[in-house]
Regions:
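Extracytoplasmic cell-surface/polysaccharide-interacting catalytic and binding patches
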Residues: 2-132, 137-257
């Protein structure tokens, strides 16, 4: 009888142990599942580039002209010369009034960030305006031809894009200047003005990048343009600012995602 009782006790202890072990294993598995599906832990929600990590809710194409990550350059021109953003509209921030409405327009998705950035700059005492926004293929052709006639083709190509190679045609890029056009208007010296310095340091807070930095001319194939800013969204803008890379340099990383 005692032997049977001892055996029964051993069996009960073993069963309890198995139940506890199973419970612990199940709890660990549940924790692992939560970790694997959380936005921070999922590799699909983070793009790692040297010097920074891009935490994202979604990725974007670097080829689609409607994508906020699209790369448009001498090496990667727009496939469709007639491309025109569907959500193009005239911006509400201060702009040059002697420009056509098209050139005073950007993509609608850019408007909230642009308005916030201009408001912050104005609060700092910087009276700035959008000097140029969207440009059609034909408008860019006019600009390029004019610069070529004035400076020669080789010089023009250092600061003006051939039609089809301009970010302005995406409706995501703009030139920013002081409202006082005598104050380094679209000139390299704008980068040393209070507004230029502030924009270079804070544009990423609003999803914009300084597209053609001074130390990256060999990469971008354009001269330093402290007035030219491009919208890419806050996550990517922050990563580019932290890493010091240009959009051209991180294109391969974005395409791997």
């Amino acid at each position: 009888m005692r032997t049977n009782q001892k055996c029964l006790a051993v069996i009960v202890v073993l069963l309890v142990g198995l139940v506890l072990a199973y419970g612990a294993m199940d709890s660990a598995l549940n924790r692992s599942k939560k970790e694997l599906t959380s936005p921070i832990a999922t590799a699909q929600n983070a793009i790692h580039i040297p010097g920074s990590t891009i935490e994202i809710n979604q990725s974007f194409s670097t080829i689609d002209p409607a994508s906020q990550w699209v790369v448009v350059s001498k090496q990667f021109p727009l496939a469709n010369p007639a491309y025109r953003p569907a959500d193009l509209h005239k911006v509400s921030v201060a702009s040059r009034l002697d420009k056509p409405d098209d050139e005073l327009s950007l993509r609608q998705k850019v408007e909230p960030s642009l308005t916030a950035m201009f408001a912050a700059a104005n609060k700092q005492g910087y009276a700035i305006m959008m000097a140029s926004g969207f440009r059609s293929y034909q408008q860019q052709q006019t600009y390029f031809d004019s610069y070529t006639a004035a400076y020669g083709r080789e010089k023009a190509e250092t600061f003006s894009a051939h039609p089809g190679q301009s970010e302005h045609q995406t409706g995501l890029a703009l030139d920013i200047a002081y409202t006082d056009m005598n104050n380094c208007y679209l000139e390299i010296c704008f980068g040393q003005t209070p507004a230029g310095i502030w924009l270079a340091a804070h544009a990423h807070d609003y999803g914009f990048i300084l597209r053609y930095p001074a130390n990256k001319t060999a990469v971008t194939q354009y001269q330093y343009e402290p007035w030219h800013f491009r919208y890419v969204g806050k996550p990517l803008a922050k990563a580019l600012y932290e890493s010091g890379f240009t959009l051209d340099e991180v294109k391969p990383y974005l395409e791997k995602h």
